[in-house]
Amino acid sequence: MKLDLNKAKKRVDYLDKLRIQRALSDTPESFQQVFKLIPLLLHFNHPDLPGYVPGAPTSIANFHPNKFQQEYLSNILATENIKNFLKKHRTFKSEAILGVYVMGSIASIAQTPQSDLDIWLCHQENLSLSARELLQQKTECIQQWAKRFNVEINFYLMDQKRFRCFRYAAPINSENCGSAQYMLLLDEFYRSVIRLAGKPL
């Protein structure tokens, strides 16, 4: 049974990779860059990187920058050795973000070059209110950065407990106006979700 479960997890990971490839095909290069950098900008909080907010919680569980993300860091942090930077930030005291997921029309036949990105960010249950507010500010900064490339991002912050109990998770853009709409969002989430980084669902 355990072996079958491991195989199933690998198949889901493979399917996510295929769906990401499909999502990025026939999209502008600027969209692709923003899409690929979202996990990186959430994982690190550096003054030279977009989305920097002093004191904001950082680190995504099990996240390791890929080649594209490392090259981006090398270009941005030109005066800093990238290997030393990654080594210094390899171990965080705690991983504030458990997972980052994209949902909605992405990678579906409904996707268009104008499609926005609905990003669900699952954070630690014990994150303080002040830390959550700083994390929200960080996502808002990333939203503003993405708009420079004509990419719209909607972030939804939630913790494990609220998600499991189907309780309200407030989106930053305030489009979610009640628990009924949230349940519809939750249904859409499970039907269309792709894991970008962090722990599997």
What does each model-found stretch correspond to?
Residues M1-Y101, A107-P113, Q124-L201:
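Catalytic core of pol beta-like nucleotidyltransferases
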Residues D116:
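Active-site pocket-lining segments that scaffold enzyme catalytic pockets across diverse folds
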